[in-house]
């Protein structure tokens, strides 16, 4: 799943990365811009699908957790689950930072690159279109980061609130079921 998303991001980054272009390349560049726009939209759709596959809405994740851990004993450690989710979140954030850096680096560096890139161009390449696509990709990466963080459990405050509710008495496992199979303190 993550390999597919990362491959889509890598392909979009490589196809959108401006290279030095020979003169007379503007007509072909317009065609490439259309393809890059299509790839950006495909990437956005792929990230939405990926986030949905990771668990959907927070309420759906909670329902899935209740079903997933309903019959588990103490074989799943709460700290292990939190640690793995934290690791996945950090890995996704690092991958998206690398992708954003490959798209042009810091805003100052992008501005310097834009000045050099468009210094000798005629009016056949619209600078706003190119900057707009870069801005779109930046926003798409930011949205992907938010979607990924939400899919992994929401904000740190939300995860903490969920954990406090889920593990309030310390005697219950992930779903509120007692260790001996009793529910809500009732005997079988």
From Swiss-Prot:
Residue numbers carrying Sulfotyrosine: 174
Keyword Signal attributed: yes
Stored PROSITE patterns: GASTRIN
Region (Disordered): 152-188
UniProt keyword Secreted, yes or no: yes
One Pfam family cited in the UniProt record for this chain: Gastrin
Keywords linked to the UniProt accession: Amidation, Amphibian defense peptide, Cleavage on pair of basic residues, Secreted, Signal, Sulfation
Record's GO cellular component terms: extracellular region
Stated consequence of mutating residue 57 to S: In clone PXC204
Effect after changing residue 85 to G: In clone PXC204
Family in the record: Belongs to the gastrin/cholecystokinin family.
Record protein name field: Preprocaerulein type-1
């Amino acid at each position: 799943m993550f390999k597919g998303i990362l491959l889509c991001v890598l392909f979009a980054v490589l196809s959108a990365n401006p290279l030095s272009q020979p003169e007379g390349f503007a007509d072909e560049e317009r065609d490439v811009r259309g393809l890059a726009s299509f790839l950006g939209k495909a990437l956005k759709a792929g990230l939405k699908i990926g986030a949905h596959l990771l668990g959907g809405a927070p309420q759906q994740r909670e329902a899935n957790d209740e079903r997933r851990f309903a019959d588990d004993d103490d074989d799943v450690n709460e700290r292990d689950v939190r640690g793995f989710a934290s690791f996945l979140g950090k890995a996704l954030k690092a991958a998206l930072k690398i992708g954003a850096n490959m798209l042009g680096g810091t805003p100052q560096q992008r501005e310097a690159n834009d000045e050099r890139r468009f210094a000798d161009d005629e009016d056949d390449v619209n600078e706003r279109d190119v900057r707009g696509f870069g801005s779109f990709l930046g926003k798409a990466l930011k949205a992907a980061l938010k979607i990924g963080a939400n899919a992994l459990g929401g904000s740190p405050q939300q995860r903490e609130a969920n954990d406090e509710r889920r593990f309030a008495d310390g005697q219950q496992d992930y779903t509120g079921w007692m260790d001996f199979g009793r529910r809500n303190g009732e005997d079988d």
